[in-house]
Amino acid sequence: MASLISDIEPPTSTTSDLVRRKKRSSASSAASSRSSASSVSGEIHARWRSEKQQRIYSAKLFQALQQVRLNSSASTSSSPTAQKRGKAVREAADRALAVSARGRTLWSRAILANRIKLKFRKQRRPRATMAIPAMTTVVSSSSNRSRKRRVSVLRLNKKSIPDVNRKVRVLGRLVPGCGKQSVPVILEEATDYIQALEMQVRAMNSLVQLLSSYGSAPPPI
């Protein structure tokens, strides 16, 4: 009878072997996905350090600055101030940087979308607004107490947030298009945006040196 029961019962070693194999396969697949994601992000970040990308951006930046100069000279209004010219140059440099990114990142798409929104606002006609008479509001003491209670709760919630998350949120407000994103997305976009800005500075320095050497060159005989 015992031999018959032993023949019927399945061996437990096969089940444990299957569990171990599943764990092994899941761990290997997760490691491969992490390695592939890291390699892809590394390739994306490495493009800003290449000379080819810097040449592409320098060409786009030169075209954008020429367009800014043409727009300022063709303007019928008075000559723009230094502050307006500086703002136009910064916007042109950022747009050229976003175009060089080819819309692969959130910050580049946000810069291009912001440009489209500003252009659409300029094209819209101003609507006539009706003057709304001022209305006096009476605030009761109970509403004041509830407002103070809400403010105190918000302060407690702010104190309970870790410093790291709060700093990351501040960083997200500095990176275009990342104000409401998660922490991993903010860190990934900020890394790419910082490297793009570093490449922008290198391209601008090279352009300034080129223009200064061209201006100081003696005239041809």
Swiss-Prot record:
Keywords: DNA-binding, Nucleus, Stress response, Transcription, Transcription regulation
Conditions for induction: Slightly induced by salt (NaCl) stress.
An individual GO BP term: response to oxidative stress
The keyword Ion transport appears for this protein: no
Presence of the UniProt keyword Nucleus in the record: yes
Compartments it resides in: Nucleus
Compositional bias annotation for Low complexity: 26-41, 72-82
Gene Ontology CC entries for this record: nucleus
Gene knockout outcome: Hypersensitivity to salt (NaCl) stress during seed germination and during seedling growth and development. Hypersensitivity to hydrogen peroxide H(2)O(2) and methyl viologen (MV).
SUPFAM superfamilies associated with the record: HLH, helix-loop-helix DNA-binding domain
InterPro entries in alphabetical order: bHLH_AtIBH1-like, bHLH_dom, HLH_DNA-bd_sf, IBH1-like
Top-rank taxon, per record: Eukaryota
An example molecular function term from Gene Ontology annotations: sequence-specific DNA binding
Domain bHLH: 148-197
Main location: nucleus
Coiled coil: none
Chain positions covered by the region annotation Disordered: 1-45, 70-89
Chain's role: bHLH transcription factor that binds DNA on specific sequence 5'-CANNTG-3' in target gene promoters. Negatively regulates brassinosteroid signaling. Together with BHLH148/RITF1, regulates the transcription of several genes involved in the detoxification of reactive oxygen species (ROS) generated by salt (NaCl) stress. Confers tolerance to salt and to the oxidative stress-inducing reagents hydrogen peroxide H(2)O(2) and methyl viologen (MV).
PANTHER family: TRANSCRIPTION FACTOR BHLH148 (PTHR33124:SF12), TRANSCRIPTION FACTOR IBH1-LIKE 1 (PTHR33124)
Assembly: Homodimer. Interacts with PRE3. Binds to RSA1.
Protein name per its UniProtKB record: Transcription factor bHLH148
Organism: Arabidopsis thaliana
